[in-house]
Amino acid sequence: MPRVSLATCRAIPNLDEEDAPLVGALADRGVDARPVVWDDPDVDWAEAGLVVLRSTRDYARRRDDFVAWARSVPRLLNPAAVVEWNTDKHYLEDLRRRGVPVLRTMWLEPEQGLTKRQLHTRFPAGDEFVLKPAVSGGAQDTGRYTANEAESRRLAIQHAVRLLSEGRSVMVQRYQPSVDTLGERSLVFIDGQFRYALHKAAMLHGPSQGPEETHIERIDATEASEVELTVAERVRQAVLAIKEELDEPKGPLLYSRIDLVNDDEGRPTVMEVAVTDPSLHFSHHPGALDVFADAIVARLDGS
């Protein structure tokens, strides 16, 4: 019986509620599937079969360890080189250089040694903005600030100072007002094919409350517009080109989620591209779990 290990983390050793049914779906297809904690020292990854990243939510605080682990796994999806690229949001600059419309981002680096005054002068002068670390997941350590309110600006500076002092790169983006009215749209691709779209309501409502803060996601099924599909396909092609430049084999990624918001002109713009362990929210689309399970089995058959 072929073996599939669904990589997760210690906080959710049996996978999250969206991914847990994948074990049964794969079993129905004759696959020995089981959740495995990625940093469990007792696991022999050479005997783990095909390893599929699913609920490895703690990688942001231990990215170097996570990337080293990914590179040590003989059969990993998505591939380790792509994971390394995707776990640092500087990847947005790679996409921008390839002509993909991405949110404009200002990067603050620890080695710049920026003072509080210098941070103050670099932050936007008006509107709202979002501040977060370049290596993060699940909106952890992410805050929404108002540029022309003194207390909000002070908290933003405090937030940036903390992250930079921890040796973490910081990204600053204008908060897109459309998120409050239209939300975000996530387009999910499985094995290179667009499968379904999701709507996520706004979830940032103020300054960061610290690294342990959690945000409640409100997800619904939606339909992708033709313009959104066009942008998402540009992203997919760009990521494929980057994948080949990283010396990974040709062919589509097993999964990807492309998160879009509207810019001030109403044009879909990339906020994030998730190809490491994105939440795919199978329960919101009939058949989505089966499509994903079939795609995994096809990778087994093709190996």
Specify the residue positions occupied by each region the protein language model found.
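Conserved N-proximal alpha/beta basic substrate-recognition cap immediately N-terminal to
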Residues: 9-114
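Anionic group-transfer/hydrolysis microenvironments
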Residues: 56, 134, 175-176, 188, ...
